């Protein structure tokens, strides 16, 4: 049971992190300076 809970926590943390990264990329790509600095991130 402890192992299941630990893996669930890890999954939740990973989902939160990927969500935050997606938000950061979106906000970067909508900012022209950041977009110019990171063209590989912004399609």
UniProtKB/Swiss-Prot annotation:
- According to the record, the residues making up region (Lacks the Ser-Xaa-Pro motif that is crucial for potent interaction with nAChR) are 30-32
One GO term in the molecular function aspect is:
acetylcholine receptor inhibitor activity
Task: Output the superkingdom of the source species.
Answer: Eukaryota
Keywords, A to Z, come to:
Acetylcholine receptor inhibiting toxin, Disulfide bond, Ion channel impairing toxin, Neurotoxin, Postsynaptic neurotoxin, Secreted, Toxin
Q: Which GO terms describe its cellular component?
A: extracellular region; host cell postsynaptic membrane
> What tissues has this protein been observed in?
Expressed by the venom duct.
Which residues of the precursor form the propeptide?
1-26
**Where, per UniProt, does this protein localize?**
Secreted
Please tell me where this protein is predominantly located: secreted
What InterPro entries is this protein classified in? Conotoxin_a-typ
**Which cysteine pairs make disulfide bonds?**
28-34, 29-42
Q: What is known of its domains?
A: The cysteine framework is I (CC-C-C). Alpha4/7 pattern.
Q: What does this protein do?
A: Alpha-conotoxins act on postsynaptic membranes, they bind to the nicotinic acetylcholine receptors (nAChR) and thus inhibit them. Has possibly a distinct nAChR binding mode from other alpha-conotoxins, due to a different three residue motif (lacks the Ser-Xaa-Pro motif).
Q: Which family does it belong to?
A: Belongs to the conotoxin A superfamily.
Protein name (Swiss-Prot/TrEMBL)? Alpha-conotoxin-like Leo-A1
Q: Source species, please?
A: Conus leopardus (Leopard cone)
